[in-house]
Amino acid sequence: MPTGSQPSSACSARVRSPTPSFLWWDVRLQPRLGTVEVRIMDGQTTVEDVAAIAALVQALASVELERCDDPGPEPRAPELIEENRFLAARDGMAALLIDARSGERVPAIEQLERILGACRRHARWLRCERELAIVRRLARQNGALRQLAHASGDGNLRCVSARLAGAYAPRTTPMHAATKIAC
């Protein structure tokens, strides 16, 4: 398993941001902090969901660190990455992504299952198996979908906000009392 040492040049080449100060990035190394920064998928609406995404990112980083010493194939064509990013942004988990190996369209959920399979051993090592398992649920029913379902009922966005506040704050806190709305 990865040791957490400084990334090799092969590993750094897999990260697409030229410098830590670069503004337009998906994943970038932050050597000053010893971290990897990732542009997050939709804002998560519960701490459990945040932990699931963090577990996925940790396990993926561990997978990639392990692969850094393997010369393997060159990074994929930027056009393929851009197309898949567009498809995912437009269609979410309903997207048909382009498989880098076969060039065929593959449901995003199948791609996710492959990724989770690759992450399983790393999640065990990182002790985040329980959190990683939540990613499957998020793929099918995430916070954005829950918010849309709440809003579609009566269209009251204040109720959506109240439900979000309730997901974060226990019902006995002053914050909850301040957001009490008849929904």
Regions found by a protein language model. Give the residues of each.
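C-terminal accessory/tail domains of diverse enzymes
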Residues: 1-183
